A protein has these predicted regions:
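N-terminal export leaders
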Residues: 18-39
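Mature extracytoplasmic/periplasmic domains
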Residues: 48, 328-408
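N-terminal secretory signal peptides
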Residues: 1-19, 45
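Conserved C-terminal helix/tail region of periplasmic/extracytoplasmic solute-binding proteins
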Residues: 397-443
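A structural signal for short loop-to-beta-strand junctions that line the ligand-binding cleft
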Residues: 101-105, 122-189
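Early extracytoplasmic/lumenal segment of secretory-pathway proteins
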Residues: 49-118
Length: 443
């Protein structure tokens, strides 16, 4: 981060914030259009004949870069969008070492920081983003509902802005140029099998409780897994951290040493790196508590296996969710009509269809007002308001997931987001942390 902004010019709707009341008000009037309602008016705005042969390659992790979303974008925009999935480490490596093989890089804040520093991205011109003024203040002021978003780790607000399109350093505060356009985010915690655990889980320390020896698992993505571990050890009172999102070497050593001891004691049944692995472990009952992503919990439920996403609201200076945000970045090689098409694609993403789609497996849109138009009133009530489902709730593909009366784990959008305690990150000691994490893996 290079400097604070002293000339923020964004005094638009997003500057007013989005209050608990305005976010959570009923959707009956606004939610008339459901998913699959057809092409959106106004797309594309450049001549269809000129863009019909264009193909954009959007690369990133499977929970963010989804084929069904690319297919709908292609249908609505008139040019082809190809989605390619890589895990977190492989994706950032591809962006940096093979930048010309990617058009749209799907990045988290820490990846945007790294890719910007390496000079492989070009800035996104804020004036060309039609819904920018309606983006939530999480991304324009670093706050929501009057509550400042925590700065442990790298919050999206800290990684979003640069001073000019070819800048290689971040700038704190809204400018005319962005490193990435946020498209999906959430608050992560643990998943558990209530039928096998036997009680409600609301604290991270449960993941390392000896009573779950041989039945627990943790995420094996070093930069994220170590933060889940830190939340556990902090919750249990075993380790105190100055900043879980940017640990000292001493804190890294304490954390990894504790993980290695747990592994040697047989505590972890497995570590996992992919969505499917986490679903299989939980659905089969091989593990009964683990680090987990929201759509993975949903996927277990679709199999008619009970699974709960632990509500880890902050208390006594501990607990809280691990926040993350993925967004779309423009690779530096884009120019001409292909760059124009990329802007059409970015604007399509915030126009509502994608926001409605991802809501159905528990993720949030940076512009809920457009996503709401593609959700039924019942879906909005369940996913955003945290209200009991007025009717059965289905996943993005129409598969029944929740019965009437079910409530979302963790409550409303505002309740969940204001209980984030840290964000996915790239630590200053990342190289050392990765070395120590590998020692944990082979222990």
């Amino acid at each position: 981060m290079t400097k604070k902004s002293d000339n923020v010019t964004n005094n638009s709707k997003s500057g007013n914030g989005i209050s608990r009341r305005s976010v959570m008000k009923g959707a009956a009037a606004a939610a008339g259009a459901a998913a699959g309602s057809g092409a959106l008016g106004g797309f594309p705005t450049i001549w269809a004949q000129e863009i019909k042969d264009i193909e954009l390659t959007h690369v990133g992790v499977s929970y963010s870069v989804v084929k069904a979303i690319g297919d709908q974008a292609s249908k609505d925009l008139g040019f082809k969008v190809t989605m390619q999935n890589l895990d977190t480490s492989a994706a950032i490596n591809r962006f940096i070492t093979q930048p010309n093989s990617v058009d749209i890089a799907d990045v988290e804040g820490w990846q945007a920081k790294l890719a910007t520093k390496r000079g492989v991205l070009q800035g996104i011109e804020r004036a060309k983003i039609k819904e920018f003024d309606n983006i939530l203040p999480i991304f324009t002021k670093g706050e929501i509902d009057g509550v400042q978003i925590p700065r442990q780790g790298i919050s999206p607000y800290e990684a979003m802005y640069i001073e000019d399109p070819m800048a290689t350093d971040l700038h704190e505060g809204v400018t005319d140029w962005m490193t990435f356009l946020p498209q999906v985010y959430n608050a992560d915690s643990m998943g558990y099998r209530p039928d096998l655990v036997g009680h409600e889980v609301t604290e991270w320390k449960e993941l390392i409780d000896p009573k779950f020896k041989g039945k627990a698992a943790i995420l094996d993505v070093p930069a994220i897994g170590i933060m889940d571990a830190a939340l556990c050890f902090e919750s249990a009172g075993m380790i105190e951290y100055g900043n879980k999102g940017n640990m000292t070497r001493e804190e890294i050593d304490k954390t990894i040493d504790a993980l290695i001891q747990l592994k040697r004691d047989g505590h972890f049944r497995a570590t996992w790196t992919t969505f499917d692995q986490s679903v299989q472990l939980m659905a089969a009952g091989e593990v009964i508590i683990q680090s987990m992503w929201s759509p993975a919990v949903a996927a277990v439920r679709v199999k008619e296996v009970p699974c709960i996403y632990a509500p880890v609201n902050k208390k006594n200076g501990k607990e809280g969710y691990r926040g993350w945000c993925n967004g779309m970045a423009l690779m530096r090689h884009l120019e001409g009509k292909k760059l124009d098409a990329a802007y059409e694609y970015l604007n399509w993403y915030l126009s509502g269809w994608q926001g409605g789609f991802v809501a159905r497996y528990g993720y949030y849109s940076p512009v809920p007002t457009t996503a709401q138009k593609f959700l039924t009133p019942a879906e909005w009530a369940y996913w955003y308001e945290g209200a009991p489902a007025p009717e059965p709730i289905s996943d993005p593909y129409g598969v029944p997931m929740e019965p009437v009366g079910a409530k979302r784990d963790g409550g409303s959008f505002v309740e969940r987001v204001t209980n984030i305690s840290c964000w996915n990150t790239l630590m200053d000691e990342a190289a050392y942390m990765n070395k120590r994490w590998n020692e944990f893996k082979v222990a």
